[in-house]
Amino acid sequence: MVLIPAIDIMEEKCVRLTKGDFNTKEVYYENPVDVAKMWEELGAKRIHVVDLDGAKQGHLVNGNIIEQIIKSCKAEIEVGGGIRNRETIDYLFSVGVKYVILGSAAIYDKDLLLYSLSNYGERTIVGIDSKNGEVAVSGWLEKTKIKDMELAKKMKEIGVKTIIFTDISKDGTLNGPNFKALENILKTGVQVIASGGISSIEDLKKLKEMGAYGAIIGKALYIGKINFKSALEVI
């Protein structure tokens, strides 16, 4: 199972939110590029970067920081947040992003999803952000009536290989992931990267046992609840 540290960028800083609420912002580091280098030095082979400003505004905002991260690191970089058109997808791949994560666009713009899949294949990941079994979009500010499991099935049928599944009610809480919801999503047969609430090496072991392809770890790393090197040794 691949362990993926998360870097959330807001106002050019590395921050964490709780339950996706922009009012809960905590700044952990002033420079996201230094943070990416730090995780790589500790052994990260892949880093999850979210443009929170982009997710909120509906277009990529922190492209320059993402470019700097790519130039500074050899680790694979996956990027989400505000990716709503072909130009942004093409731009991100052209500067060296390994995976692009489509959230709102995967739901509301099927043509864009199909464009990304036909041009970039498995490097296109869909982010399913769920609250009480229903999908939320636009930086989690809007809730839809779409069921997370139905969306996962639909994505698999379209040709999506990997989904990042986040339970919003768990994100940033350090209460452990929503294992039940993850179990259901795994039943669809897509590769699942778990995100939200991961707070211990025990959580990671359980996710691995369940068959998760990867785990995105955020707040637990930044406050020292999980030691990244120790986690890599165990998982």
Swiss-Prot record:
<keyword id="KW-0413">Isomerase</keyword>
<dbReference type="InterPro" id="IPR011060">
    <property type="entry name" value="RibuloseP-bd_barrel"/>
</dbReference>
<dbReference type="InterPro" id="IPR006063">
    <property type="entry name" value="HisA_bact_arch"/>
</dbReference>
<dbReference type="GO" id="GO:0000105">
    <property type="term" value="P:L-histidine biosynthetic process"/>
</dbReference>
<dbReference type="InterPro" id="IPR044524">
    <property type="entry name" value="Isoase_HisA-like"/>
</dbReference>
<dbReference type="GO" id="GO:0003949">
    <property type="term" value="F:1-(5-phosphoribosyl)-5-[(5-phosphoribosylamino)methylideneamino]imidazole-4-carboxamide isomerase activity"/>
</dbReference>
<keyword id="KW-0963">Cytoplasm</keyword>
<dbReference type="InterPro" id="IPR006062">
    <property type="entry name" value="His_biosynth"/>
</dbReference>
<dbReference type="InterPro" id="IPR023016">
    <property type="entry name" value="Isoase_HisA-like_bact"/>
</dbReference>
<feature type="active site" description="Proton donor">
    <location>
        <position position="129"/>
    </location>
</feature>
<dbReference type="GO" id="GO:0000162">
    <property type="term" value="P:L-tryptophan biosynthetic process"/>
</dbReference>
<dbReference type="InterPro" id="IPR013785">
    <property type="entry name" value="Aldolase_TIM"/>
</dbReference>
<keyword id="KW-0368">Histidine biosynthesis</keyword>
<feature type="active site" description="Proton acceptor">
    <location>
        <position position="8"/>
    </location>
</feature>
<dbReference type="GO" id="GO:0005737">
    <property type="term" value="C:cytoplasm"/>
</dbReference>
<comment type="pathway">
    <text>Amino-acid biosynthesis; L-histidine biosynthesis; L-histidine from 5-phospho-alpha-D-ribose 1-diphosphate: step 4/9.</text>
</comment>
<keyword id="KW-0028">Amino-acid biosynthesis</keyword>
<comment type="similarity">
    <text>Belongs to the HisA/HisF family.</text>
</comment>
<dbReference type="Pfam" id="PF00977">
    <property type="entry name" value="His_biosynth"/>
</dbReference>
<protein>
    <recommendedName>
        <fullName>1-(5-phosphoribosyl)-5-[(5-phosphoribosylamino)methylideneamino] imidazole-4-carboxamide isomerase</fullName>
        <ecNumber>5.3.1.16</ecNumber>
    </recommendedName>
</protein>
